[in-house]
């Protein structure tokens, strides 16, 4: 149980693939123009991570170390192709919106990194949990960045949610800011870099406050000197 909690804590916050390791920045910055796109790519990446880690862990005893990387890439490519076809079949609007960034999951350093660093050395269950935690950590970062850019750029949230969840999801669209003209900087690549910088700064501030709180609550027990110990006796 402690190992599972540690994996969740590492993937979601302490070793977040997007905000700590800074992996997968290309899709993180390019696709996060809306919350829907960010959530769609994040969930697709999470599914790929879980399936890839499970397959690599299950086959780890039979994969020669000399050719493990090409085999891992083949496994990742097969899983990504399957996910791409599923999105094409059941969420075609999202498939068109994400475009080339779905097949580019194959080259995402998060996927191959977790396969090599964790799944190849650990049991199937923990490897699947590691993939889920890392994927959800990246998804949360993508979603927050996408929501921030969409709100500042268009004044809306969950615009186009029907592309991901179906026609019923049109009711999820929320008009937060009533803008006469869109704030283009938030929607362009410079806005993505600025938003990512704000997220990194926010995480740093939260981490520092958590460290300070732990330091303040830590109880220090003073050590008795030899003379004090004799008097006590």
Swiss-Prot record:
Location, primary (coarse class): membrane
Compartment(s) of residence: Cell inner membrane
Sorted UniProt keywords: Cell inner membrane, Cell membrane, Electron transport, Membrane, Translocase, Transmembrane, Transmembrane helix, Transport
Pfam families: Rnf-Nqr
InterPro entries: NqrDE/RnfAE, RnfE
Protein origin, superkingdom: Bacteria
Catalytic activity, EC: 7.-.-.-
GO CC terms, sorted: plasma membrane
Keyword Electron transport: yes
Transmembrane segments: 18-38, 39-59, 69-89, 92-112, 128-148, 182-202
UniProt key word Electron transport: yes
Enzyme class: translocase
GO biological process terms held by the UniProt record: electron transport chain
Topology relative to the membrane: Multi-pass membrane protein
Job of this protein: Part of a membrane-bound complex that couples electron transfer with translocation of ions across the membrane.
Subunit (UniProt): The complex is composed of six subunits: RnfA, RnfB, RnfC, RnfD, RnfE and RnfG.
Family indicated by similarity: Belongs to the NqrDE/RnfAE family.
Protein name (Swiss-Prot/TrEMBL): Ion-translocating oxidoreductase complex subunit E
